[in-house]
């Protein structure tokens, strides 16, 4: 019987995935590197090693490519901040670019549309997910009450610049990392939709393998028949 679960990898144990029905949540204590299941995935690998402040990050940079590999293997979605270098490192298409060799494609969204306190611009990478389903269910709009990062008032005054969210509060690191419940539910729904697509791909791959084996068997059978005929001493013409 095919599982109806999806796996959420590299997630916060206090976040929304841990309590969601049908979600197998893998936080740091479970070590998402060990996931070898066939269920589609939602992946949130650490962004520090691939962001603008990567030289200060102590996160494991190998988790990003591993998360990409999982999405390409079983289907689903990967979430990372806008401009993440992980996209270049793993040759994922940026939003607006053609799909890659895995059928993967990307979309830019803002998590404020699902209830985050800040805009939190995000890039999503999909494999096995129908773009029509995504565009039919994606949200836009929303007004932030906080800003993820902004310079101090002294820096703004010294440089004579106008900061877009100067009147907003700065988010704490906890608020910044938080995934809105509605956003998580949307990603889970999209990842679940990849199950049939990825199953069809596997079936086609298996069918191709069977055909290759069948052709080889035919050739081997012909060779065996010819050898048997020669051994039987068929009269020469």
Give residue spans per PLM region:
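Class I S-adenosyl-L-methionine
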Residues: 1-208, 212-221, 235-237
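TPR/TPR-like alpha-solenoid repeats
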Residues: 230-233
């Amino acid at each position: 019987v095919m599982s109806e679960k999806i796996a959420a990898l590299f997630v916060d144990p206090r976040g929304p995935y841990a309590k969601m029905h049908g979600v197998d949540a893998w936080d740091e204590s479970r070590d998402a590197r060990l996931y070898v299941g066939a269920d589609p995935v939602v992946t949130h690998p650490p962004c520090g090693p691939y962001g603008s402040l990567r030289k200060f990050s102590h996160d494991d940079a190998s988790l990003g490519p591993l998360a990409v590999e999982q999405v390409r293997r079983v289907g689903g979605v990967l979430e990372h901040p806008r401009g993440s270098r992980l996209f270049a490192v793993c040759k994922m298409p940026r939003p607006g670019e053609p799909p890659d060799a895995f059928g993967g494609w990307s979309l830019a969204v803002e998590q404020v549309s699902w209830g985050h306190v800040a805009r939190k611009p995000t890039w999503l990478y999909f494999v096995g997910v129908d773009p029509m389903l995504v565009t039919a269910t994606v949200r836009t709009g929303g007004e932030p009450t906080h800003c993820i990062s902004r310079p101090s008032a002294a820096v703004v005054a010294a440089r004579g610049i106008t900061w877009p969210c100067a009147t907003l509060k700065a988010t704490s690191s906890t608020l910044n990392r938080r995934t809105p419940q509605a956003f998580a539910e949307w990603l889970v729904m999209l990842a679940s939709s990849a199950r049939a697509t990825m199953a069809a791909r596997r079936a086609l791959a298996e069918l191709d393998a069977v055909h290759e084996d069948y052709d080889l068997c035919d050739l081997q059978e012909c060779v065996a028949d010819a050898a048997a005929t020669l051994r039987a001493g068929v009269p020469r013409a």
